[in-house]
Design a protein with these regions (language model features):
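Residues forming the flavin
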Residues: 1-532
Length: 532
């Protein structure tokens, strides 16, 4: 079968081919693919429908933060709802279905809700269904309950087994990107008992998504060689496919290891998943950062995704969402995506940079001071409308738009135990609190250090401090030379004047909804989250 959007390179095994189904149609992919990357390679952009308005949705991200491409995996008793296509490893015989639709994915009858969006704004359910009161249990409540939820379950007994267990270590390292790998090397050589956990099946973090070098070798090769070296230590336990899900008292962490989710059927005697309790003396969070979008009119069409995710699909999975791509950015990182895609033969329709002093390029057109004010394409992006500094508008024909509004450190675990994040004007994002969980330190992009050199250095330093507190004598880390260019960024959150600019694409929350909530005094983020 023809994979129209498959590029050269990548970290997939082209010597093998996996067959899989999505909504009853047959497709092919390769070992190393996720369901999302394989669908993009086969030129599938429409993968779901939004919760409230049932608007068409495509892939936005390349990781566990994905709000749109949420599907049902497998069939029969093993049917599993609400699984992110971006984290589901492809395997031979995989069957997936789209969710939250009445009819087909292309012709969802519930999309009629979008026509009544003016009546379904923030807090509408607090203001309606009030009269007559007798209608609530027999009329209103059944309708609301039927509309709620996304996927469905099989109602059959699960044939697989699930386990729980207990682990103990001196240092738990959360995240296996450059900071986590550097920290693990220091800890391994000190003789400490180390656990290195990462939610991905391929350790390396952003090194798997970039094209820069470390010590004259690719970041991918350095990550692979480092993982192999760590495997040689008896005091190191590597845990890929493992999500650290909570920080509890006395250095206890919860972790979910997906032992067999990447297989059609678990191996004999093996559980599908294991819930671990990890007891650790010290912990180091190296969970990286998540790119944030920019809100603009109709920014939710299939084909519009984060620029960093676009780079991940291109460099790691050898996939482009379209053969013609545009970029909308407020920082230099968006230009990296354009450069990488151009090097792989993808046409760059233009880079729209909100900064008047945006860097120029001989590889593609840069629209400095421009803004994306609208998009077109019902089931997939076809054009974007751009406003220029001179007050005029122009149209760019493209099948995909990469959006980059900066990066937010992944500090979720540091906010457990009532830790309060600290705002940083330097990166226009929240950074880890100083009053986080006892024994937990932070390194790398999760700390706000967005260069590879900075991540490596902070990972090694924080590990050294933690080990010395435990009485170990770590040797000085020998770190590879890596890129250390700080990305320039101008904070920019949304395009003024837009009426339907989406902030929460899964739940159909717009900028307008947030403003209305604030106007009605739902200012606290917890109140805002529930009111919208």
């Amino acid at each position: 079968m023809n994979q129209a959007n498959r590029l050269a390179g990548g970290q997939i095994d082209r010597s093998q081919t996996f067959k899989f189904k999505f909504d009853g149609k047959n497709f092919v992919g390769h070992p190393g693919d996720t369901l999302a990357s394989a669908l993009l390679a086969n030129d599938v952009r429409l993968m779901g429908r939004s919760f409230k308005y049932h608007r068409p949705r495509g892939i936005l991200t390349a990781g566990s933060e994905e709000p749109n491409a949420i599907v049902e995996l497998r069939e029969g008793a093993r049917q599993e709802p609400n699984t992110r296509a971006t984290t589901a490893e492809l395997f031979d015989g995989l069957t997936a279905k789209s969710q939250n639709k009445v009819g087909s994915l292309k012709f969802d009858l519930m999309a009629i809700n979008d026509r009544f969006s003016n009546f379904l704004t923030a807090g509408f359910y607090y203001k309606t269904f009030m009269w007559p009161a007798a209608f609530w249990e027999k009329v209103y409540e059944p309708i609301i309950r039927k509309a709620a939820g996304l996927g469905s379950i099989s109602f059959k007994d699960d044939p697989d087994s699930y386990d729980r267990g207990f682990l103990y270590c001196d240092l738990l390292i959360i995240g296996a990107g450059p900071a986590g790998l550097a920290a693990a090397l220091v800890a391994a050589k000190s003789g400490a008992e180390v656990i290195l956990a990462d939610e991905d099946f391929n350790m390396g973090g952003r090194l798997n998504s970039e094209r820069f070098s470390l010590n004259n070798q690719s970041g991918v090769d350095w990550a692979r060689s480092t993982v192999l070296e760590l495997k040689s230590f008896q005091n190191v336990r590597l845990m890929p496919r493992t999500t650290i899900l909570g920080v509890f008292d006395h250095g206890i962490y919860g972790a979910l290891e997906r032992v067999s989710d990447h297989l059609l059927v678990p191996q004999a005697g093996k559980p599908r998943q294991i819930l671990w309790q990890i007891y650790t003396k010290r912990s180091l969070l190296c969970a990286g950062a998540t790119e944030r979008p920019i809100a603009f009119e109709n920014n939710d069409r299939p084909g519009i995704m984060l620029a960093g995710a676009m780079r991940s699909y291109a460099n790691r999975w050898a996939v482009t969402p379209s053969q013609s791509v545009a970029i909308f950015t407020n920082n230099d990182d968006g230009h990296k995506t354009a450069i990488d895609l151009k090097a792989l033969g993808v046409n760059i329709a233009g880079v729209v940079d909100i900064r008047l002093d945006a860097p120029d390029s001989d590889l593609y057109e840069v629209i400095a001071g421009g803004q994306v004010v609208n998009t077109n394409g019902r089931l997939g992006l076809t054009t974007v409308t751009v406003s220029t500094p001179n007050g005029k508008t122009r149209s760019l024909a493209c099948g995909a738009l990469g959006v980059s509004g900066g990066w937010n450190p992944n500090i979720h675990l540091t906010s457990h135990h009532r830790g309060r994040p600290v705002w940083s004007d330097d990166i226009a994002a929240f950074c880890p609190p100083t009053d986080g969980p006892a024994g937990l330190s932070v390194a790398g992009a999760a700390l706000g250090s967005f260069t590879t050199a900075g991540a490596l250095s902070s990972g090694a330093k924080k590990a050294t401090v933690a080990l010395e507190e435990l009485g170990f004598k770590p040797t000085k880390a020998v770190l590879p030379e890596a890129e250390g260019t700080i990305t320039k960024m101008t904070p920019f959150w949304y395009v003024e004047g837009c009426s339907r600019a989406w902030l929460d694409q899964q739940n159909d929350v717009t900028v307008k909804d947030v403003k209305l909530s604030h106007q009605e005094n739902f200012v606290s983020v917890e109140h805002l989250k529930r009111y919208t």
